[in-house]
A protein has these predicted regions:
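Beta-strand-rich domains and repeat architectures in extracellular enzymes and scaffolds
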Residues: 13-40
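Structural hallmark of WD40 beta-propellers
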Residues: 30-34, 104-108, 115-117, 126-128, ...
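Terminal intrinsically disordered, low-complexity extensions flanking WD-repeat/beta-propeller proteins
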Residues: 1-8, 58-69, 219, 254-255, ...
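Short coil/turn segments within WD40 beta-propeller repeats
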Residues: 19-22, 39-44, 93-96, 105, ...
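WD40/WD-repeat beta-propeller blade-loop signature
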Residues: 20, 29, 84, 91-94, ...
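Short C-terminal beta-strands that terminate individual repeats in beta-propeller domains
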Residues: 11-16, 52-56, 76-90, 126-132, ...
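Loop/turn segments within WD40 beta-propeller blades
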Residues: 24-30, 98-105, 110, 140-146, ...
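Short loop/turn segments that connect beta-strands within beta-propeller blades
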Residues: 48-50, 120-124, 162-165, 204-207, ...
Length: 431
């Protein structure tokens, strides 16, 4: 069993919000991350990036010491730390759910005050519905252009159309809270996970419930479509990952044990690899078929539970939140390199991402104008989940450690080796 030894807590960089964070989401086209807070505030932050000017100046001086540099495995490049660029307050209670639209032109938020809202590219609230649900809203997910999905604490899921500025679908799916929602990539099907132990499959064309599984004793807390839409994976209260084969809902096709506590949040890294956040405070890498706990990315201090993780647009950073009011950023490019090379030894080059100029733009969200493909496809069961399968697969072969220095942050180039852990119990205890 492989362990990504280089992905440890000292690779993190963090920004501190003004209150405890309930939800985060990376911008789909630009280097921002949005956070919904317990006091109803929404904050927008930049993500860590290279300071190219510092890189250029340091390269000149380093050329004079090429002999010593070649014998050393460490060189430095300044990093621009995250900074808050926008604060909004349009909910009276906690902002539990937040997501950018698919194009990045706007932001959707949901609150325990039962309201939903849409924020435009300039940070202005352009649409707000009080009493959007009869219960506090627990999850919001983006849909096709101009739409989004919301789920509440009573098991109701709604679809909202910004063009009509109203709900166009409402289904009572569960007897407890809707924990998570995922989709096939042409949005003909949605699958929900609920605190009553069920998952529900929705036909979005016909706007009706197709199937609800039997109730498990475990809460279903997070959900993904994997293997090009042929597998549904849920994270549970007990820590096991439940796996269904698409269309065979009467029983599980497989199960992955190993998490000692509940799996609150999951993201798809690729069709075979998931990242999980658990209540034991650790972010893990999990392989699917073969089913393995591959390693860990890091953890928050004091064993705080991981409440949410999110993947950046270029898949270079994972953002995570816990109960410490911080967004932590974890560099995962080493994981991409290790998966691509299948090598025991990996050398990493320069980061080379982000302009790091810190410019403030009038429109913080301004995304691409291209509409997503909404073509219908009856073969929905083979489609992949959401937009992560379309992400740029560029491999920078890089490993970054963010270390706080005297007012600046530095990158250290390193060589990371994968080690084999023979004892499964050791992984369970230490990963």
């Amino acid at each position: 069993m492989s362990h990504f030894t280089g992905l440890t807590e000292d690779t993190s960089m963090q920004c501190r919000a003004s209150a405890m964070i309930f939800d985060i989401d990376f911008h789909p086209t630009r280097d921002f991350i949005a956070a919904g807070l317990v006091d109803g505030t929404v904050e927008l932050w930049t993500t860590p990036s290279n300071d190219n000017s510092s890189t250029a100046s340091s390269s000149a001086s380093s050329s004079n010491t090429s002999t010593s540099s070649s014998s050393s495995s460490v060189s430095t490049t300044a990093i621009v730390a995250p900074r808050k660029v926008l604060t909004m307050k349009h909910h009276t209670k906690s902002c539990r759910a937040i997501c950018f639209d698919q194009q990045g032109a706007g932001l959707y938020t949901g609150s325990s005050d039962q309201s939903v809202a849409a924020v435009d590219a300039g940070g202005a609230v352009v649409w707000h519905v009080s009493g959007a649900h009869k219960a506090p809203i627990n999850v919001i997910r983006p849909g096709p252009t101009g739409t989004f999905f919301s789920g509440d604490d009573d098991g109701c899921v709604k679809v909202w159309d910004m063009r009509q500025q109203e709900s166009v679908m409402s289904l009572d799916l569960a007897k407890d809270f809707i924990a998570d929602i995922t989709f096939n990539d042409n949005y003909t099907r949605a699958v929900t996970a609920s605190g009553d132990g069920t998952i529900s499959i929705i036909n979005l064309r016909q706007q009706k419930l197709m199937h609800t599984t039997e109730m498990f004793e475990d809460d279903q807390l997070s959900i993904l479509l994997m293997k090009n839409g042929t597998k549904v994976v849920t994270g549970t209260q007990s820590g096991a990952l439940n796996i269904w084969a698409w269309g065979k809902w009467d029983d599980l096709s497989d199960r992955i044990p190993g998490h000692p506590q509940s799996v609150q949040t999951m993201i798809k890294y690729d069709e075979d690899t998931m990242l999980t956040g658990s209540s034991d405070g650790i972010i893990r890498i999990v392989g699917l078929h073969p089913n393995k706990l591959l390693g860990m990315i890091g953890e928050h201090e004091e064993d705080f539970p991981i409440e949410k993780i999110s993947l950046s647009r270029d898949r270079n950073l994972v953002g995570s939140i816990s109960h410490d009011d911080c967004i932590k950023f974890w560099d995962v490019r080493a994981m991409t390199d290790a998966k691509g090379r299948g090598s025991a030894g990996v050398n990493f080059a320069d980061m080379g991402n982000g302009d790091g100029n810190g410019d403030d733009d009038d429109e913080f969200f301004g995304g691409d104008d291209d509409d997503m493909d909404e073509s219908d496809d009856d073969g929905a069961t083979t489609a992949a989940s959401s937009s992560s399968s379309n992400n740029n697969n560029n491999n920078n072969n890089n490993r970054v450690m963010f270390n706080k220095g005297e007012g600046s942050y530095k990158i250290k180039r390193m060589t990371i080796k994968m080690v084999v852990v023979m004892d499964f119990l050791m992984i369970c205890n230490y990963v």
